[in-house]
């Protein structure tokens, strides 16, 4: 195994025993692929498939005028270049989008001959379409957003029952529902009397026969569709029927059944069983004589015409009178329906009999009345309405998915139609479709077949970004279509062009509304790389067209057996959304139909192959799947006699020959966040859920520290989240500094004619959506050789290209003076000194200058009534300097607002006369630092409205940006020139010159000659080899193009910066100030491990007071041992033991390095760690001595270990490693009290645990209020930090004071501290005067109560007793 540049610096020892068949796929593919498919941007218009945008256009166009003489046709669409790049859009607060132009063709026909008279083609601007960034997000109005995928009910047909809840008798009522992708729902349902009803769009129910009549069937045809016939023969006054013995099975014999010899096979009153059926078949009976009573209540199958011309209608119940009529009417033979009470109910026939409608017209009118109540029905209107409901491709679409599910459920074959026409035909319902659904429903009612499981993942599909955007786009286009149809009739006469006909605003509005305010377009959770990835891989059952929290029951939220490998059973929010919002499993992906698939290895005749097959939940039915950890021999044969498998949702044991598939990985079940929890298999599911949710809230620490005990998924998450800088092509590091890396690309990876230079610009100290800090740090050195996919720079919360959410802390499980009561956490001051849990938060504060009625607001340093000291941090323009350290109340941006004329006091008049006008007519409305905040200004951005003159600060910022950009471009060009020069020297070395430059014809070109020449001279040389001459000219052309491109880029940047900014109406200027706040850990901050073990820091002790071991090493964290047993998350204890071993091994290596042992000894020790304890073998022999030294140096602080989920380290292996590290096998040590030096009673579990600092910091939560704003009605203080509110003193708190008898305190709480308006003003004045006297009055809420009672019409008055 070859190690990459990043891997070999720090190899993670992996305990996984199972072979890796496939690597985890790209984790953001569900987002990226979906949107790429939607746009089809890379494909030429001719080759675009009929999906996504193309399909949306195709479905709406061509648009024809009402007369049919003019039509608009869609030709192709194209996307332009976005005006600003992603970073600029975030800064400017604009949307990252590309303009879309659509080529439209207008065809005008001759009115009489209908031949084409005129064709006009034109490009029409259709608004902007948001583009996805590389990492699967969208930038909308300057904020990064994620479109969450939706898990909704798949279109198709579903059969269900009410579980006996509807009717009081508890009878189970069956129903069928046809759900289209868009259009009306069609429901069939039984009632308690076993009649079949139909509902359209959940409206009032009609008898199901109404819709059959509307489809054009009469009674006899309907009966023919649903029933088999039984011929009845009338012979000499007795009746005979054809005998089909199988049909009689299970019925009660109403008379003796005898064979031809008169031997009785079944006696009257006995139930006919399988033995009787066999006897009847053996006896050779073909006809059966039946008594008249047997035929009573049977149903006629068709109209029977009597001798005298009378007709007995189909679907008539036979009775004595009718039988007499038949005999007298000379009928020798007629058909009845085959019905019985067991498995051939007469439901459809009974429904027909109950139906009062006579023919098709009646039925259509009935349907019209239900759909359009109150409108007078006409024949045409009823006909149109019915046809538009299910048979018009404009109004109804099952979609390919729906048609596939529909045909599958009804047991029909299905192939996807590729062309538009066949898609439209398959998208609408046919008569057969409706009849087949009804037939299946009746069969299920008859006891044949099963109802569907709604929560089966074969009946729920994922709608991703692309599909949702396409639907919104189609909505916009349909709005456009309506407007265009109106105008098309004008186009025939007024000579209009496509541009005049199409107004793109509705399309743009629909798209903007979706991305801006849809429930599924969410503000990206950007706490750390894991939270980003998880947010993009989320699937939600909520949202438009989905469930609502209130209506979702337990079944929908529950884990279903089909979730295995598709949706994570662990990661879901706690609270009202539990089970409705899920996360995709690591290996899951959505197929073309939107159903979730998971990979399996194929198993043939008990032998496991390496072929991987993705199966959806539908395809998985009937397969036999072995677990990933099933024992397999060297040839891949399953070794156990009976293998534990999953079959039809159950766990059973089967012989190897029956196994069809096998899991690809033990981590297949869980999501990315859950797969990052080591020893997950030893944790209770509830705690694992908390663990995976809390990892997403971890704040990136100042110094990222990789976990000593990981799971091997860390590198995947860091790579795919996009926070690291990854090399796109391999090569050599040509230049590196804090803000950029330049790579000279390998020859073999270059494209012909390019200079082969890749430049990576790093992101420095930027604010994330959650106000955490995004910063990238370089990992490579000058001259290093890197390969494609290597990590060049770490992002936030990554260390060496691995996810690093927290810190490895030395923990002890013991009690310490009550400081770990109720899960509190005791920390050592050392953690604070080493800045281990320090994080940087960046806040954005903005100041907006508007145009008001009284005049424009102005940003200035000339602020009335403010001393010099307050202005000391501002420049001449009134904006704070970068680097200024500011605290609460400091002015960041000076701003004055004009105020209206007021009556002046004599003193003010005097001031005005002395100091001039300025101070009087403006008020100070500057931007100040909010209370409780203290930090350093790290950046300032000034945006000025187009057309206004920019102030000095804005010009200075602009100049600095231009200078930096020019420097960048110059360096870029210089790098290209150097690379080109090197290539030219390489090409010309050893060649013969044909003259040109400073060489003469026939000169041999050697390295010495060439290296002394300038690039210009080198380009002039003409070698004799034509191939090389050709390549030289290519390089020359490339350099010219590059130079022109760089000039163009600079001019473009200058133009962008010079033009003003698009600000909202009435805004003249916006100043954004960015503050960096350093947050050290302090009591009140929330911390957690990865196993759901969370707590609040209770105290930070001096290092010398912390418990320490015999060597004097103090612990960093003291945790409560009582937090483990009841919560059943034992994973944390195993992690602690393994962490201790990892740290101990690191110390051993450190000791060896300090003693300067030989590299051979080092190799032996490393081999013991990596290859002698079990798990995956590492090939350390492939590393050079130098690389071994680098590796050992990086392992000094601990050897990183990986214990994959469900395939992790075993107890024995942990003990072996502890022994190797020369530590006690128990993982427990004797500790001493730091204050007294006394030994604690018993050994304590000490080790290293990975602890996270969560984004619930006490600084963000705590605030203090003296006076502030009050609620309007109750006059009580508001609540919450944002409103600068007070602390609620509720009902229970009042009880507490009553119990203590603290009457005065209680009176103070309920009056002057709350809503006694006069009392509180009085006490405020008193306190200011230094007098604490309280004079309570009437609380305002009492007045509110009396007013409420009065509003009920009860007169209540307060009498003041003297």
Curated annotation (Swiss-Prot):
Free-text function comment from the UniProt entry: DNA-dependent RNA polymerase catalyzes the transcription of DNA into RNA using the four ribonucleoside triphosphates as substrates.
MF (Gene Ontology): DNA binding; DNA-directed RNA polymerase activity; ribonucleoside binding
GO cellular component, one term: DNA-directed RNA polymerase complex
Pfam families on file: RNA_pol_Rpb2_1, RNA_pol_Rpb2_2, RNA_pol_Rpb2_3, RNA_pol_Rpb2_45, RNA_pol_Rpb2_6, RNA_pol_Rpb2_7
GO biological process: DNA-templated transcription
Protein family membership: Belongs to the RNA polymerase beta chain family.
EC numbers, comma separated: 2.7.7.6
InterPro entries for the chain: DNA-dir_RNA_pol_bsu_ext_1_sf, DNA-dir_RNA_pol_bsu_external_1, DNA-dir_RNA_pol_su2, DNA-dir_RNAP_su2_dom, DNA-dir_RNAP_su2_hyb_sf, RNA_pol_bsu_bac, RNA_pol_bsu_CS, RNA_pol_bsu_protrusion
Official protein name in the record: DNA-directed RNA polymerase subunit beta
SUPFAM superfamilies: beta and beta-prime subunits of DNA dependent RNA-polymerase (SSF64484)
PROSITE patterns: RNA_POL_BETA (PS01166)
Quaternary structure annotation from Swiss-Prot or TrEMBL: The RNAP catalytic core consists of 2 alpha, 1 beta, 1 beta' and 1 omega subunit. When a sigma factor is associated with the core the holoenzyme is formed, which can initiate transcription.
Domain of life: Bacteria
PANTHER family: DNA-DIRECTED RNA POLYMERASE I SUBUNIT 2
The organism's taxonomic lineage, starting at the top: Bacteria, Pseudomonadati, Pseudomonadota, Gammaproteobacteria, Moraxellales
Keywords, sorted A to Z: DNA-directed RNA polymerase, Nucleotidyltransferase, Transcription, Transferase
Reactions the enzyme catalyzes: RNA(n) + a ribonucleoside 5'-triphosphate = RNA(n+1) + diphosphate
């Amino acid at each position: 195994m070859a190690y990459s540049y990043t891997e070999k610096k720090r190899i993670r020892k992996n305990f996984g025993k199972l072979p890796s068949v496939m690597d985890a796929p790209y984790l953001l593919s569900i987002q990226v692929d979906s949107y790429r498919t939607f746009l089809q941007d890379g494909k030429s218009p001719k080759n675009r498939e009929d999906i996504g945008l193309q399909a949306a256009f195709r479905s709406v166009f061509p648009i024809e005028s009402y007369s049919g003489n003019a039509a608009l046709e869609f030709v192709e669409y194209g996307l332009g270049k976005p005006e600003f790049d992603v970073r600029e859009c975030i800064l400017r607060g604009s949307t990252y989008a590309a303009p879309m132009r659509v080529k439209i063709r207008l065809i005008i026909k001759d009115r009489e001959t209908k031949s084409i008279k005129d064709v006009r083609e034109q490009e029409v601007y259709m608004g902007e379409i948001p583009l996805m960034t590389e990492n699967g997000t969208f930038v909308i109005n300057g904020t990064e957003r994620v479109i969450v995928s939706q898990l909704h009910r798949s279109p198709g047909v579903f059969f269900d029952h009410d579980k006996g809840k509807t009717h009081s008798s508890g009878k189970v009522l069956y129903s069928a529902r046809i759900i289209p992708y868009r259009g009306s729902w069609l429901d069939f349902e039984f009632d308690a009397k076993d009649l079949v009803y139909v509902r359209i769009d959940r409206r009032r129910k009609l008898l199901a026969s109404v819709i059959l009549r509307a489809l054009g069937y009469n009674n006899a045809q309907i009966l023919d569709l649903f029933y088999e016939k039984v011929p009845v023969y009338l012979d000499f006054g007795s009746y005979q029927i054809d005998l089909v013995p199988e049909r009689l099975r299970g019925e009660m014999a109403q008379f003796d059944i005898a064979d031809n010899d008169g031997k009785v096979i079944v006696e009257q009153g006995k139930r006919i069983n399988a033995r009787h059926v066999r006897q009847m078949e053996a006896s050779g009976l073909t006809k059966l004589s039946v008594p008249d009573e047997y035929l009573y209540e049977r149903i006629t199958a068709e109209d029977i015409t009597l001798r005298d011309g009378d007709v007995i209608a189909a679907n008539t119940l036979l009775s004595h009178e009718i039988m007499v009529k038949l005999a007298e009417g000379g009928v020798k033979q007629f058909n009845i329906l085959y019905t019985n009470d067991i498995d051939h109910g007469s439901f459809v026939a009974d429904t027909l009999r109950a139906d009062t409608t006579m023919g098709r017209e009646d039925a259509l009118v009935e349907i019209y009345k239900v759909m359009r109540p109150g409108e007078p029905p006409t024949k045409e209107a009823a006909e149109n309405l019915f046809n538009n409901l299910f048979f018009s491709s404009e109004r109804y679409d099952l979609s390919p998915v729906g048609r596939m599910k529909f045909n599958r459920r009804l047991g029909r074959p299905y192939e996807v139609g590729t062309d538009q026409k066949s898609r439209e035909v398959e998208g609408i319902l046919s008569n057969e479709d409706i009849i087949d659904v009804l037939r299946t429903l009746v069969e299920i009612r008859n006891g044949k077949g099963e109802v569907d499981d709604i929560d089966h993942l074969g009946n729920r599909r994922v709608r991703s970004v692309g599909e949702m955007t396409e639907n919104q786009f189609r909505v916009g286009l349909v709005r456009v279509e309506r407007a265009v149809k109106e105008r098309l009739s004008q186009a025939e006469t007024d000579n209009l062009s496509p541009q005049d006909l199409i107004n793109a605003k509705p399309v743009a509005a629909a798209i903007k509304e979706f991305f801006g305010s849809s429930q599924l377009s969410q503000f990206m959770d950007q706490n750390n790389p894991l939270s980003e990835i998880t947010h993009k891989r989320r699937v939600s059952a909520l949202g438009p067209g989905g469930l609502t929290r209130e209506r979702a029951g337990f079944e929908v939220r529950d884990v279903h057996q089909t979730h295995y490998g598709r949706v994570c059973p662990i990661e879901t929010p706690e609270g009202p959304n539990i089970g409705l919002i899920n996360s995709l499993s690591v290996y899951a992906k959505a197929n073309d139909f939107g159903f979730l698939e998971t990979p399996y290895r194929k198993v043939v005749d008990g032998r496991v192959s390496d072929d991987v097959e993705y199966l959806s939940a539908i395809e998985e039915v009937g397969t036999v799947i072995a677990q990933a950890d099933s024992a397999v021999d060297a040839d891949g044969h399953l070794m156990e006699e009976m293998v534990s498998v999953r079959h039809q949702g159950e766990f059973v044991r089967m012989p190897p020959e029956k196994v069809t598939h096998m899991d690809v990985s033990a981590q297949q079940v869980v999501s990315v966040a859950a797969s990052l929890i080591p020893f997950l298999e030893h944790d209770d599911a509830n705690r694992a859920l908390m663990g995976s949710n809390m990892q997403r809230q971890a704040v990136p620490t100042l110094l990222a520290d990789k976990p000593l005990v990981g799971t091997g998924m860390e590198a995947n998450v860091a790579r795919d989240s996009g926070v690291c800088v990854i090399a796109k092509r391999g090569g050599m590091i040509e230049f590196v500094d804090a803000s950029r890396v330049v790579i000279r690309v390998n020859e073999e990876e270059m494209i012909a004619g390019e200079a082969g230079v890749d430049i990576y610009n790093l992101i420095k100290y930027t604010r994330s959506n959650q106000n955490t800090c995004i910063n990238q740090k370089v990992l490579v050195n000058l001259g290093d050789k890197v390969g494609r996919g290597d990590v060049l720079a770490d992002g936030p919360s990554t260390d060496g290209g691995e996810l690093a959410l927290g810190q490895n802390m030395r923990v002890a499980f013991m009690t310490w003076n009550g400081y770990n009561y109720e899960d509190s956490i005791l920390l050592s001051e050392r953690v604070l000194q080493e800045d281990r849990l320090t994080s940087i938060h960046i806040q954005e504060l903005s100041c907006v200058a508007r145009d008001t009625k009284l005049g424009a607001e102005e940003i200035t340093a000339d602020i009335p009534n403010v001393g010099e000291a307050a202005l000391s941090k501002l420049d001449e323009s009134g904006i704070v300097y970068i680097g200024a350290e500011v605290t609460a109340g400091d002015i960041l941006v000076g701003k004055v607002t004009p105020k209206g004329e007021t009556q002046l006091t004599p003193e003010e008049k005097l001031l005005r006369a002395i100091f001039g006008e300025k101070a009087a007519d403006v008020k100070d409305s500057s931007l100040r630092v909010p209370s409780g905040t203290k930090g350093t200004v790290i950046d300032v951005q000034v945006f000025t409205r187009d057309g206004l003159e920019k102030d000095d600060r804005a010009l200075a910022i602009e100049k600095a940006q231009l200078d930096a950009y020019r420097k960048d471009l110059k360096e870029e060009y210089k790098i290209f020139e150097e690379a080109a020069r090197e290539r030219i020297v390489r090409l010309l070395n050893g060649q013969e010159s044909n003259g040109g430059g400073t060489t003469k014809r026939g000169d041999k070109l050697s390295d010495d000659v060439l290296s002394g020449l300038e690039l210009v001279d080198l380009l002039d040389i003409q070698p004799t080899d034509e191939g090389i001459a050709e390549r030289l000219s290519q390089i020359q052309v490339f350099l010219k193009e590059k130079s022109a491109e760089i000039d163009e880029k600079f001019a473009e940047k200058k133009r962008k910066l010079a033009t003003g900014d698009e600000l909202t109406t009435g805004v003249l200027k916006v100043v954004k100030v960015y503050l960096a706040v350093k947050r050290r850990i302090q009591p009140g901050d929330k911390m957690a491990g990865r196993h759901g073990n969370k707590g609040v820091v209770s105290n930070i002790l001096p290092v010398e007071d912390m418990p320490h071991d015999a060597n004097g090493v103090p612990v960093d964290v003291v945790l409560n041992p009582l937090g483990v047993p009841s919560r059943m998350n034992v994973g944390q204890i195993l992690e602690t033991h393994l962490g201790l071993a990892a740290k101990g091994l690191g110390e051993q290596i450190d000791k060896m390095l300090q003693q300067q042992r030989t590299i051979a000894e080092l190799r032996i020790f490393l081999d013991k760690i990596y290859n002698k304890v079990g798990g995956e073998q590492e090939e350390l022999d492939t590393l050079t001595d130098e690389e071994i030294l680098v590796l050992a140096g990086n392992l000094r602080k601990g050897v990183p270990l990986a214990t994959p989920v469900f395939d992790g380290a075993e107890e024995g292996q942990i003990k072996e490693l502890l022994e190797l590290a020369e530590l006690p096998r128990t993982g427990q040590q004797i500790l001493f009290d730091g204050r007294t030096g006394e030994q604690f009673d018993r050994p304590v579990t000490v080790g290293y645990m990975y602890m996270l600092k969560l984004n619930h910091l006490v600084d963000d939560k705590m605030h203090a209020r003296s006076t502030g704003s009050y609620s309007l009605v109750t006059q009580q203080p508001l609540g919450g930090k944002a409103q600068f509110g007070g602390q609620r003193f509720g009902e229970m708190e009042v009880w507490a004071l009553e119990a203590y008898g603290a009457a005065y305190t209680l009176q103070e709480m309920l009056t002057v501290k709350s809503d006694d308006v006069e009392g509180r003003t009085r006490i405020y004045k008193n306190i200011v005067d230094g007098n604490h006297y309280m004079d309570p009055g009437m609380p305002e809420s009492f007045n509110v109560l009396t007013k409420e009672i009065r509003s009920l019409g009860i007169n209540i008055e307060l009498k003041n007793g003297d």
